[in-house]
Amino acid sequence: MAPTSTYSYTERKRIRKSFGSRDSVLKVPYLLQMQKDAYTAFLQADMAPQKRTNEGLQAAFNAAFPIVSHNGFVEMKFVEYNLAKPAFDVRECQTRGLTFASAVRAKVQLIIYDRESSTSQSKVVKEVKEQEVYMGEVPLMTDKGSFIINGTERVIVSQLHRSPGVFFEHDKGKTHSSGKLLFSARIIPYRGSWLDFEFDPKDILYFRVDRRRKMPVTILLKAIGLNPESILANFFVNDNFRLMDSGAQMEFVADRLKGEVARFDITDKSGKVVVAKDKRITARHTRELEQSGTTHISVPEDFLIGRVVARNIVDGDTGEIVAKANEELTEALLKKLRSAGVQDLQVIYTNELDQGAYISQTLRIDETVDEFAARVAIYRMMRPGEPPTEDAVQALFQRLFYNPDTYDLSRVGRMKFNAKIGRDESTGPMVLSNDDILAVVKILVDLRNGKGEVDDIDHLGNRRVRCVGELAENQYRTGLARIEKAVKERLGQAEQEPLMPHDLINSKPISAALKEFFGASQLSQFMDQTNPLAEITHKRRVSALGPGGLTRERAGFEVRDVHVTHYGRVCPIETPEGPNIGLINSLALYARLNEYGFIETPYRRVVDGKVTDQIDYLSAIEEGKYVIAQANAALDAEGRLTGDLVSAREKGESTLLSAERVQYMDVSPAQIVSVAASLVPFLEHDDANRALMGANMSRQAVPVLRPEKPMVGTGIERVAAVDSGTVVTANRGGIVDYVDATRIVVRVNDDEAVAGEVGVDIYNLIKYQRSNQNTNIHQRPIVKKGDVLAKGDVIADGASTDLGEIAIGQNMLIAFMPWNGYNFEDSILISERVVAEDRYTSIHIEELVVMARDTKLGAEEITRDIPNLSEQQLNRLDESGIIYVGAEVQPGDTLVGKVTPKGETTLTPEEKLLRAIFGEKASDVKDTSLRVDQGSSGTVIDVQVFTREGIQRDKRAQQIIDDELKRFRLDLNDQLRIVEADAFDRIEKLLNGRVANGGPQKLAKGTKIDKAYLASVEKFHWFDIRPAEDEVATQLESIKNALEQTRHSFDLAFEEKRKKLTQGDELPAGVLKMVKVYLAVKRRLQPGDKMAGRHGNKGVVSKIVPVEDMPYMADGTPADIVLNPLGVPSRMNIGQVLEVHLGWAGKGIGQRIGDMLRDQAKAAEMRKFLEEVYNSRGRKEDLSVLSDDEVMAMAANLTNGVPYATPVFDGASEAEIKDMLKLAYPDDIKERKGLTESRTQAYLYDGRTGERFERPTTIGYMHYLKLHHLVDDKMHARSTGPYSLVTQQPLGGKAQFGGQRFGEMEVWALEAYGASYVLQEMLTVKSDDVQGRTKVYESIVKGEHAIEAGMPESFNVLVKEIRSLGLDIELERS
């Protein structure tokens, strides 16, 4: 296998050793591609208006316009739309609680036609008014694929819904007790009425519109213009008879007789009996009849009786209809036909097997006579009770399926429809045609006749994904449709009054529709931001729920189950546990959407058994046509499939097939799983249920203080970290010019710098920012000044990343052994050292908000002047009444002082006097300050003050603005300094050695410019030098212009920033001032916290043990975590054991590298050892591209352990793990550590007694995570608190500061103990006995302990409820 020769900046620092057996032909695509592409297509912001395609916003406008007035003389046309630059950037929107959006302005024309000179054919334009009209604000997507709505980051989840088109299915025999299959068909449009066709148990075919009352299908067929004759002609073939005086002659058709039982003797032309009565007719018989030249067979009279006439039979003489189409033949009718001289008779051919008389039977129960009557019947079904006038009837029928405004199949629907009914073209009209309806009924009848197969609803060829763009477009359309109605009403006025387009269009409906969708839709979700993996997974989620989708309650087992078409499209592992299982899925790693919204997955093309590098993306329907080999199929050196039989999939079934039949091959073994599942090493050794938990729990891992890369990974870590957007990557290559904790400045390479633009990139890092889940988002630079970067290199780590790789946990030394029952039932025993070293300490940031409102009694005030508070309680507030940054606060501490006016009370004369003397105002206001909640404490890290326009800013608010501006000015100055330095460097290179025509300091013409001269001249005077060469002069001029422009743009940027900061803030109605205080809380690991590995092995910390008591190895190394070995076998997640073994090897090799560095080994020696580590097994790495310094720098990074990649389904084998263990622990180290021969177990010693445990213990390193279920957030206690209004019982839950429910079983427990008094107080004074509660409180205050239990309020509620039923119930004392 070819080694990888190019390494990025971070890879050079630490290469992950991969055990993948073959390189992936296709790189993992950008993981947020689906979201970003969909929204880009919706906005088409960067496209010139003329070049925009008819999708997204453009399609919405095209559908709504032109709007024509009722009289037809005024028209409003849409020309183009533009998107304005958003007023605030993402960060500002988050801080101010705004929506990151852009205003849409549409250019529309109001055309008024001249009534006098216009005719119905040609209209003469009287005047045209063109204007740009505001059409609401459209939220913009951030770089990370999310939206900022009202200051919070949200994600629009894609929806998996049933594709428009036609579907055929049956009820699986569930409807009728006999188990008979009832077939049905359904035409589903994108917009418009659903049309269903269904058989009932009596084999009569019905249709229904929008699930209303069912009607015989022949009514619909008549309504589309067919008469009974043409209906029968469309569905049946005819048997031709010639009537004789007695009996008849039947035309001989061999295929129709085969398999039937002869009801009479069948003779040939000569009269010879070929088939005797009651014998079955076989192919031999029909052949004999054909050979004898028989064209007609004589049939007796009773053979005709019961047959159905195929067409109307008219008496030639009188013109009277003797027999109607679909009439059954009887003796009387036959007599009538003979007397009318009818000789030739056509009846429909039916049989019991494959030619049922369903349509004929349906026609018989249909009472409508003609097309209009049929349409009236449909009108009555749709609009019961309304009088069916002719116009209304025709209009309704037309509007149901034939009007593009009300019915839209969509491109997808038409494509699916045509494919289903066997048409070749994939395009066509977006409304139904009569032929379409007829074709569907024909296929349904064929299905009932046993021809063809029903559709599989859960096949991914029948389900498509609606992305953000499409969902937003639908909302925009709804808004425009409302506008269209309003405009249509008012358009007529434009003839008389001088109205402009903006007078007619009110954008409110659009804004309302979008606001409702982005703010409250089921698919618009609060982004899960616990860690980068959670973010990326949330954006790749595909939900079957939501408007137009399924509901939890109605979704059956089949919809939730894994389907064969999920392969490579939707992850079979990652889905939530609980009621949503299988309804919310995650997109597979390589999956993408095609133009129709169906999920595609890539395959390598195989030609004559040779695997090519050509990649084709196939949708689920296309995949069914091919034979596809697995990604791990054996190949020879030339890339040919080896072996006689290859494991492959055909039509969803896995089989062994010959290599010649294979047409495609999987791209990568990881292609079937999602991002989260692909980060689980040794996934192939885990049971699916546990793998599901592992994938789900890695999304709940809390970012810790110092992230640590997983020792055993899968190779996807780097991709996931970069694509999630938490790390900072270089936009362009260059050299690092400046680094500090808050920003990185890169001087861009000359070849990547755009002419006339500043050749400097400045990356401002995020510091201590609160995420949606209150975790800490924090970026740290990982580059040094002078480092050379390429485009795309990671230059700063974010939360939960380490050197550009996702790092959601810590590598811990794990021992699998029981320890005094402390790891019973998945409990986890942890060493004190882990806590002391802050390995799992995380920072959580809480946002506390206080608002000063305008109340009826006067405005609330944020102030330091709070009644009844001591100076000690106020000493951390500044003069504006706001706490200072850096203060450490405890529960109950005041953060922001606020007073609210309270209603005037009548004062006694003494109080009036006192207030007159002392000006005491305290009694007018009550203290409503913001305080720290019970159970939380921390450090104030930031304060923000927002003031409404027109309200005086306090000193604190002004100071915050000044600080912000100062910081911004510093930033700009730094940028300018670097830009200038860069410009002067370029000028120096440009002028050095050139001839000048003159310049400052009396530079003579023809003098060569050198560095000494340039150093002697002020840099700003370099522009006065006049080079002899014109080209150099123009370059110098362009640098000068670029510099001046940059200075000017910086001044403008500063002005704009100042304007933004000093203008009033947009606050909710009635709010005058808002203060946000951010608290940072340090959470250390403690008993009760939930932890987990990546294999679904979760548990709760039971005890933190002093390090000296932990089991330790022979060389004194104590274990970090002790897990129960019983957690492995029954759970069948063996991946964790393999991870522990490989992690143990990685750590051992790291320690050997550390020993070599301590012994000051030479680079060559180190290179030799690293060659052995990286290139003895698995994928080869080309270490020769690294310089000696880079090799030593990498070695220093590997001392904590060599990171491994064991790709999903292509991971390290047992032999490879054993080789690595041998390399890590040569015999001398093995002995010293007390390892067994396999090096996977060690003899441990009891930390408390020093005795050796009897049996060896499995020990090694596992990447262990701390999950977001922290005991601090769950711990809760209450004495008194809020009560429910109706029942007067304490509320429930921590958020409401509620109590614990004393339920039925707890009551039984007290009854069992006979604790009657305890039970009484539980059911009364501690619950809802209102008088009793107050009395207990009084007696406690007095120091007494008497309890008087009264009537519980819930009893009163019960009495009231009984009264509401009309039963008078009263309590009487006995």
Swiss-Prot record:
Its domain of life? Answer: Bacteria
Q: Does the keyword Nucleotidyltransferase apply?
A: yes
Q: Which UniProt keywords apply?
A: DNA-directed RNA polymerase, Nucleotidyltransferase, Transcription, Transferase
Q: What class of enzyme is it?
A: transferase
Give any single GO term for biological process.
DNA-templated transcription
Q: Which reaction does it catalyse?
A: RNA(n) + a ribonucleoside 5'-triphosphate = RNA(n+1) + diphosphate
Q: How does it assemble?
A: The RNAP catalytic core consists of 2 alpha, 1 beta, 1 beta' and 1 omega subunit. When a sigma factor is associated with the core the holoenzyme is formed, which can initiate transcription.
Q: What is this protein's function?
A: DNA-dependent RNA polymerase catalyzes the transcription of DNA into RNA using the four ribonucleoside triphosphates as substrates.
Show the PANTHER family listed in the entry.
DNA-DIRECTED RNA POLYMERASE I SUBUNIT 2
Give the family from UniProt.
Answer: Belongs to the RNA polymerase beta chain family.
Entry protein name = DNA-directed RNA polymerase subunit beta
Q: Which organism is it from?
A: Paracidovorax citrulli (strain AAC00-1)
